[in-house]
Amino acid sequence: NIIEQIENFNIKNNNIEISTTQKSPSALDIDNIHSELYSEPKDAYFTQNPYCIYPSENGVDFAISIDEAKNLLKEDKEECSIPLKVLYPNITTSMLGNEAFPDLLSQYSTSYSTRDQKRTTNLKLAANKINGTVLMPGETFSYNKVVGARTISAGYQEAPIYVSGKVVDGVGGGICQITTTLYNAVVYANLDIVERSNHQFVPSYAPASRDATVVYGSIDFKFKNNRNYPIKIMCTVSNGIANFQIYGLRSNNDYEVVISNRVTGTTSNAIYSEAYKILKQNGQVISSTLLSQDVYKRH
């Protein structure tokens, strides 16, 4: 049978002839490439019934005309590169107004000295980067990614920072107060903390285990939107008050959040502390979750 013939076939003693045909490659069709690549930017919008937010999307297009792209192919080159450009929507997700984020989920404030103008400048620069940020469900916020590098060219000033257990002047000093204020607002909104670190010393603007520090490139503050709907972060730095507000849509499953922090021990060189997130409903404690256990150096 056929199977036996195949098994008994010895390729070394038999020649196999395969007919081939030569065919030139198809010419590149710029119009077709453009139609497959091109995408329109999409404006953000929302509906109230049912409640749903549709985020904005960037588009893409040739950075040159189609005729210019076709002329590139006529050049005698082995490779041809067509530059591209991003098309931005007219209405981004962060531009959606209060109607899209009707409920105040949480807010938190810390105070700062307006006499230190350089530090105040740093606070405002960092806050402005975060203000208006929208997080979709499941999306993670990275402080370092959103705020970016703290450099002189970005407008940051030298102000006191903690380095190797000492207080020295450094570019961007003070922005950890923005991190700390946001951290507390995030906890009160009952969002998931992904990454958070405490300072070397207990800062003046927050009690032990209620702070959050960042160092660009090494220490970040991250949290995740664990809600079913998008949230929007609003912040202001004015008249000695740094304030964060987180907006979204409340649900029947939301709890009252209480943060309980305490110093658990001290030595001549260190302070030990911890913080818990307590969820309440109708005055009854539903759960108590450890947020952090921290160690600080004494000044």
Spans of features found by a protein language model:
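Short flexible coil/turn linkers enriched for glycine and charged/polar residues
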Residues: 12-14, 227
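Aromatic-residue-lined binding/catalytic grooves and analogous aromatic/hydrophobic interfacial grooves
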Residues: 8, 12, 33
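A cross-kingdom signal targeting lumenal/periplasmic-facing segments of multi-pass membrane
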Residues: 15-20
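Well-ordered beta-sheet/strand-loop patches within structured domains
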Residues: 4, 21-299
